[in-house]
């Protein structure tokens, strides 16, 4: 009996489905009645777009999280130049967790000083790095195994991208540095203006401008991502590394392909030099990580930092939003 009842109900639904839908009466002679009839008809099939208290409450409760996150660091004053500009990107270097309250922060200029690269790689940064982090800073003394880390391609595993600097308070021995680790940074000192990202001009490469025209015609996203790349080389038969910043609106996989193309000659030269002494710890060529994003329609501002008779041309991304990612080995 139960089966027969279900069959009868299904047959009834199938028969009703063959019938035409019910008609709707709409007055065509009276304007107010016509508007009311159309409105009633549409209300059966479409939801109202009029905001209600419930919808507003739900929108406020699920608002995107845009509160910036800041981090404070204590570093030895001799390892961090007081002339580093606001917005310079900071990297935290740590080999072991020994419970010390002191940190080690590296900047593009201090990393260039440690890298062992020749001046031709970034001539302006090379000059300023020699002034800010010369022999008197003792920067290399804090990383006694630097050469080994570069030779084995492990330096980036101890280097964590932090974010742009928004404040530095210097004293004789200890310096307090504040960084915007997530979101848009605000200066801690008055006036509390936005702090963007400041990078040396000779260390930044625009991948979208240097890529072939076929790729440049592809649709661009709403944001341009800033990347940092650290590659391991050999200069004058000694281990070295090179820090380079890239910007692109492409996807990550395509960016990695363009970075490999950018370093094609360097990759070939390195593996030719090491062809007789290659082993597994020397196979890593480089790694890349994301630093954050800027709007696609914003353009960096060219500025110049004057340092003891020389100048450092920099690019300032005013609308930079920090969103650091982990290092990814690309070769």
Curated annotation (Swiss-Prot):
Belongs to the herpesviridae TRX1 protein family. The lineage of its organism: Viruses, Duplodnaviria, Heunggongvirae, Peploviricota, Herviviricetes. Its main location: virion. It is found in: Virion; Host nucleus. Interacts with TRX2, MCP and capsid vertex component 2/CVC2. InterPro entries: Herpes_1. Keywords: Capsid protein, Host nucleus, Virion. GO terms for cellular component: host cell nucleus; viral capsid. This is Triplex capsid protein 1. GO terms for biological process: viral capsid assembly.
């Amino acid at each position: 009996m139960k089966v027969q009842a279900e069959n009868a109900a299904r047959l009834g639904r199938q028969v009703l489905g063959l019938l035409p839908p019910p008609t709707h009466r709409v007055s065509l002679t009276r304007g107010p009645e016509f508007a009311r009839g159309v409105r009633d008809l549409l209300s059966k099939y479409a939801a109202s777009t009029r905001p209600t208290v419930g919808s507003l409450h739900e929108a406020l409760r699920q608002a995107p999280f845009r509160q910036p996150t800041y981090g404070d660091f204590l570093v030895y004053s001799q390892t961090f130049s007081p002339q580093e500009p606001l917005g310079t990107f900071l990297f935290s270097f740590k080999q072991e967790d020994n419970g010390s309250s002191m940190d080690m922060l590296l900047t593009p200029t201090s990393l260039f000083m440690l890298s062992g690269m020749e001046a031709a790689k970034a001539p302006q940064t090379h000059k300023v790095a020699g002034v800010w982090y010369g022999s008197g800073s003792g920067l290399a003394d804090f990383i006694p195994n630097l050469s080994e880390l570069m030779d084995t391609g492990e330096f980036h595993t101890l280097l964590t991208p932090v974010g742009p600097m928004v404040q530095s308070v210097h004293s004789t021995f200890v310096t307090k540095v504040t960084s915007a680790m997530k979101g848009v940074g605000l200066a801690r000192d008055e006036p509390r203006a936005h702090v963007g990202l400041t990078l040396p001009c000779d260390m930044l490469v625009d991948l979208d401008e240097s890529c072939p025209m076929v790729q440049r015609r592809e649709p661009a996203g709403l944001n341009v991502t800033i990347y940092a790349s650290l590659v391991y080389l050999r200069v004058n038969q000694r281990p070295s590394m090179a820090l380079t910043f890239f910007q692109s609106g492409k996807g990550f996989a395509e960016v990695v392909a363009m970075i490999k193309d950018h370093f094609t000659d360097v990759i070939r030269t390195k593996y030719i030099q090491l062809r007789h002494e290659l082993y597994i710890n020397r196979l890593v060529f480089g790694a890349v990580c994301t630093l954050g994003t800027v709007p696609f329609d914003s353009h960096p501002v060219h500025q110049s930092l004057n340092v003891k008779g020389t100048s450092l041309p920099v690019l300032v991304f005013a609308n930079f939003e920090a969103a650091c990612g982990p290092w990814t080995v690309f070769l």
